[in-house]
Design a protein with these regions (language model features):
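Residues forming the Rossmann-fold NAD(P)(H) cofactor-binding site
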Residues: 19-23
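Conserved glycine-rich cofactor-binding loop
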Residues: 7, 14-16
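Conserved Rossmann-like nucleotide-binding pocket used by diverse enzymes
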Residues: 9, 34, 54, 81
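Flexible N-terminal pre-Rossmann segment of NAD(P)-dependent oxidoreductases
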Residues: 1-9
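Glycine-rich phosphate-binding loop signature in dinucleotide/nucleotide-binding domains
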Residues: 71-76
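The beta1-alpha1 cofactor-binding region of Rossmann-like NAD(H)/NADP(H)-dependent oxidoreductases
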Residues: 54-67
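Rossmann-fold scaffold of SDR-type NAD(P)-dependent oxidoreductases
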Residues: 11-12, 78-86
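Conserved glycine-rich Rossmann-like NAD(P)H-binding loop of the short-chain dehydrogenase/reductase
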Residues: 26-44
Length: 87
């Protein structure tokens, strides 16, 4: 799959599988990458990758939907969503 110039969202990106996935995907030059995690350490991870970060509990449907709406407002779309929270 070609992800160059795509808008990517990765949950659970502060560590583990989500973090590893973000590090790999950033090498493919996506148009944007948005990292989501319940831990505020996602902010540091995002800064190191020149990505956007959002601290939210994905189990809280209203808060999570608000973050997704913000991402769509900023980037016009989400082309690839990688759900890794809680894995």
């Amino acid at each position: 799959m070609n992800i160059h110039n795509k808008n990517i969202v990765i949950t659970g990106a502060a560590n583990g599988i989500g973090h590893a996935l973000a590090k790999r995907i950033i090498q493919e030059s996506p148009k944007s990458i948005s990292l989501i995690d319940i831990s505020s350490s996602v902010n540091e991870v995002a800064r190191s990758m020149n990505a956007d970060s959002y601290v939210v509990d994905v189990a809280n449907e209203n808060d999570f939907q608000s973050v997704l709406n913000s991402i769509i407002d900023k980037n016009n779309s989400i082309d690839l969503f990688c759900s890794n929270a809680g894995i």
